[in-house]
Amino acid sequence: LRCDNSMSFCQPFKIDIPDATLNSVIERVAAYPWHEMPNDGGWDYGSNLDYMKELAQYWVNEYDWRKHESAINIFSQFRAQVDGIDIHFIHEVGSGPSPTPLIISHGWPGTVVEFMKVIEPLAHPERFGGKVEDAFTVIAPSLPGFGFSGAPPRPYGPRKIAGILNALMTEVLGYDSYIAQGGDWGGTISAWLGFDHSKSVSYTHLTLPTTAI
């Protein structure tokens, strides 16, 4: 991995949301004007109002962001500037002498949190009864404009984003060959990775494939 504190374009990253930001979110949710919302008692015209009130109360009174923040920060994270955009990504180096690089891309609306339960088994299969030779080095990026990645200067389509992710894998991280996996928009992006960057992408795995490119 070629990212460290001495490099301006790629540095270690940890999530640390200020208390003031968290409090602001809680205050806004708590103060939401529910009386202004139409209520037909069902789901025909959107989310059920009673359900949304219950969800908001859970968010205000029970949800513990710090717990989830700590769970994400267990993994090594970085931010790298690619094509002028700061790309946030998890980089979990796999076990053994030669783990296969694997980039996994989320969809919309989604984040890298989708992958929290699979990163460790993929990177360290021996901890779960598997074989160390089946390990992957897992790279889970936040797509541009999502999570802790910066927003692009204009709308970017999946093909453009695929080029950014390939640059992350080959130019920033230095991998000659890797596997691409994705679902939803991540599946479309992964398909473009395989189509446009076949010299680097050895395989693609799509959990929600597109019918045509």
Predicted regions mapped to residue ranges:
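Conserved small/polar residues in nucleotide/adenosyl-binding loops
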Residues: T204-T210
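Glycine-rich "HGGG/HGxG" loop immediately N-terminal to the catalytic nucleophile
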Residues: G130, L143-Y156, A191
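Gly/Ala-rich beta-loop-alpha elbow adjacent to hydrolase catalytic centers
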Residues: G182, G186
